[in-house]
Curated annotation (Swiss-Prot):
It comes from Centruroides hirsutipalpus. Keywords: Amidation, Disulfide bond, Ion channel impairing toxin, Neurotoxin, Secreted, Toxin, Voltage-gated sodium channel impairing toxin. The keyword Aminoacyl-tRNA synthetase does not apply. Expressed by the venom gland. CDD domains: neurotoxins_LC_scorpion. It is found in: Secreted. Has the structural arrangement of an alpha-helix connected to antiparallel beta-sheets by disulfide bonds (CS-alpha/beta). It comes from the Eukaryota. Belongs to the long (4 C-C) scorpion toxin superfamily. Sodium channel inhibitor family. Beta subfamily. This is Beta-toxin ChFII.9. Gene3D superfamilies: Knottin, scorpion toxin-like.
Length: 66
């Protein structure tokens, strides 16, 4: 599974400025999911790959970014 990291409180994606390989996104994906996850900056938000199927990613059901 893959997808954007989402903030559970706001419903917003984790933003990033440096597109492509991005240490911040790798770190956040691994903290949020697990150590074998990978991340990069895509469309100015952190995109995570190699996630488990039950991982919660953006968009959250019934919660819009404010």
């Amino acid at each position: 599974k893959e997808g954007y990291i989402v903030d559970y409180h706001t419903g917003c994606k984790y933003t990033c400025a440096k597109l492509g390989d991005n240490d911040y996104c790798v770190r956040e994906c691994r903290l949020r999911y697990y150590q074998s996850a990978h991340g990069y900056c895509y469309a100015f938000a952190c995109w995570c790959t190699h996630l488990y199927e039950a991982a919660v990613v953006w968009p959250l059901p019934n919660k819009r970014c404010k």
